[in-house]
Amino acid sequence: MNHHVARPANTGILVLDYGSQYTLLITRRLREIGIYAEVIDGRSAQPPTDFTAAGIILSGGPDSVQDASARRLPAWVFALNKPILGICYGMQLLVEHFGGELRSGKGREYGQARLNLAPEMVGPSGALFYGMPVTQTVWMSHGDDVARMPQDMVAVGRSDDGVVAAMVHKTLAIAGLQFHPEVNHSEYGKQLLENFIRNVCRAAINWDSGSMLAATLDYIRESVGSANVLVACSGGVDSTVAAALLAKALGSERVTAVFCDTGLMRKDEVSWVANALKELGLNHVEVLHSEALFLNALSGVTDPEAKRKIIGRLFIEEFERYATGHQAEFTHLGQGTLYPDVIESAGHGAGAKVIKSHHNVGGLPEKLKLKLCEPLRYLFKDEARQLGAQLGLPADMVDRHPFPGPGLAVRILGEITAERLHILREADAVFIQALREHGYYHQIWQAFAVLLPVKSVGVMGDNRTYQMTIALRAVNSTDAMTAGVGDLPMSFLTHVAAAIVKKVDGVNRVVYDITTKPPATIEWE
């Protein structure tokens, strides 16, 4: 398998991943502030040779430093002589390295806590905490804590129960936090990260959509050369922006956009996608009608991971079949893989527990005949949207709600059948249309319907019914790493529920999912 991955910048903050599901959130916050940041495996034997770190952040993680098998700091981290900020497990690694001691806490501390800083740390001499309140709310998630401070470090912040929550080195630009500044619940976390960039690393704030676009276009031209590219399009924002980037960089004549109709699309999706791609100026748009192939392969399959693997495998096989069956010599396969896709599939090899496989990165065969070109692999969803706007894509395309690569297969719990797909398509269409008509569509980051494997008793007229249940989900997010519940009025939800039951045969009950991410993921499977 050949990965051609665009690195949009060659300098910034290097984030070492020790298995935390918040790792990419650190990266996202840094980019929001205006500096490029990149994640590598915390166990890497050496730093990237083509990336200059202005500073280093050590992520949290599920390990205990007291375990012999726990991941440790590589020696090169200190040899680089760059500022270091350890977060949670990252702080505990620093405690161990400098000769301190850790202990297992009485219980895992998870949730909001109060941080009490030493007053001198928020003044001009306290670069990391400059301008912040002495007392503030932070987000804790740890099992171990400091039993004895290293001689070279000083505790500058504690929680209300006396746990060391912040420490700094006496002479070096090294600090540790026992809380997560990257999480929104840490009320001054973003300011702290900006202080680390500006005051500690002395790094430039120069990361924006303009630099993203220029670097990505340059990379595509350099990596693809004079070859032709086959772009795998799903109709979502990611693959559409990837196709537009490739066409912009190479010229539309060298780019063929292929949309695989898996039979797992939303209502009227196929015609909408084909027309949208042509409106982008792409001269070569092909639709592969593969519905029967996918439905046959998914027959009887109920495990969500198995569904994703099957879809991912067939997805690639269909594009390979198309490429080898045509005279044009495609050497590259373009995909809209995003950074969160990679991290949720543990694609960095950093040991983060796999939450779910993504069809772009989890179902690829080991011997892929086409070289992968993934222009968005280092970018987040909102950054992809920014690039789309920069390229002049229509707002209704750029601002379209995210849609998973496996399509409705991960929104049908249980077996996939033509009948169940029809029910879900119709229910989802009612929900989305209502959001648009009532002006809520652009207030919500993502909304969709889910078909549950549950039937319930109902009554219609004088007759008893025993029919399917639809769950509605609406969330707000910026990067898909965390998500809050969409604040839709109960009157609106009642209206949608009534409309679905009335218009969609086979459904007699509608429920609303009010779970955040975490603990849930956005999609149900």
Name what the model sees in each region:
Residues W76-G90:
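Short alpha-beta junction capping motif
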Residues G86, G90, V95, G235:
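Gly/Ala-rich beta-loop-alpha elbow adjacent to hydrolase catalytic centers
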Residues M1-L58, P62-A68, F78-L80, E96-Q327, ...:
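RNA-binding accessory domains that recognize and position tRNA/RNA substrates
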Residues S69-L73:
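Active-site loop/oxyanion-hole signature of alpha/beta-hydrolase fold enzymes
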